[in-house]
Design a protein with these regions (language model features):
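PRPP-associated nucleotide enzymes
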Residues: 1-204
Length: 204
């Protein structure tokens, strides 16, 4: 019975791995792996340690707000590594049309947590033009928190329109299309454990 239990447990992760393309067997529309799984996880661990050091435990649970959908994996991994007390919530906004940022940010789903008198950490997948992050930071500051800081997985400096300061940054990357680790193209590739450069779609 013990052998059967171990065999069943071990086979589940193997099956999941087969459903995810390996870095050396990428789909034709993915050009290369930009950031590998191990590199991403190391950086997330480092960011969590920085956050733990910056927020005093005596000031209550940290409110971690992940921006859907792209930051949901980053938010989960980051939150799991935090040692200080925290609460996780999510918010959804829309600023992209046809894969390009429009500059018109709309709130699609708000958080349920009250931010007044609390430290808030906004977790975003990518800093592109800066419109979305600027909108969120300004909106959250109007809710009278103790502080609002930002954690961003990827930064594209070449795409900046607004000058924004990121408190906790994962990686700076070139101006290329990227998918994986929560980021998608047409709802595909979100669950890749790495981040890959995508060949630009035809006409883009």
């Amino acid at each position: 019975m013990k052998r059967a239990t171990r065999s069943k447990t071990a086979s589940a992760p193997a099956k999941r791995r087969r459903n995810s393309p390996k870095p050396d067997r990428l789909p034709a529309d993915l050009r290369r792996v930009l950031l590998g799984e191990a590199e991403i996880q190391r950086r997330v661990e480092e960011l969590a340690a920085q956050i733990d050091a910056d927020y005093p435990e005596t000031e209550g649970p940290l409110l971690v707000v992940g921006v859907l959908k792209g930051a949901f994996i980053f938010t989960a991994d980051l939150a799991r590594r935090l040692r200080r007390r925290h609460v996780v919530d999510f918010i959804a906004v829309s600023s992209y049309q046809g894969g390009q940022t429009s500059g018109n940010v709309r709130l699609m789903m708000d958080t349920r947590q009250n931010m007044e008198g609390r430290h808030v950490l906004v977790v975003e997948d990518i800093l592109d033009s800066g419109y979305t992050l600027d909108f969120l930071v300004r909106s959250f500051r109007q809710r009278h928190p103790l502080s609002v800081r930002t954690a961003v997985l990827l930064d594209k400096p070449a795409r900046h329109v607004l000058p924004l300061k990121v408190d906790y940054l994962g990686f700076s990357i070139p101006d290329v299309w990227v998918v994986g680790y929560g980021l998608d193209y047409d709802e595909q590739y979100r669950t890749l454990p790495f981040i890959a450069e995508m060949r630009p779609p035809k006409g883009r």
